[in-house]
Amino acid sequence: MKKLLAFFLFLFVMPLFAHHGRGATYDMKKQVTLKGVITEVSWRNPHVAIYMDVKDNDGKVVNWAFENSNVSTLARQGYNRNTLRAGQKITAVVNPSAQGTPRGLVVKVILADGKVVMSRESGANPVD
């Protein structure tokens, strides 16, 4: 009976850990810096998403998607849906997709005036 209970507990708990495992989705050992213009900010759970147009090496515009913390974590840190808006020029430092797709996990965002927002460097803003 204990083995059966442990098995079912394992089945329900493991997906929770899988959701927060970033290693398979993002290259956590690498950071890329991208400059561009925000096209959309999706301020909703489970994670705030930032979409940004970036010119690649050939001059072609590529729309990147960046995952950030959840709404309540960012709100506790003083950010809201007006912190970033479509049309803003920003620099995003991200852990890139492990699959090579134009996606990333936000390390920090730098506004046009040089102000750093939504940083998780040195544990300042851990992604939930």
Regions found by a protein language model. Give the residues of each.
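Structural detector for short beta-strands of small beta-barrel domains
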Residues: 30-46
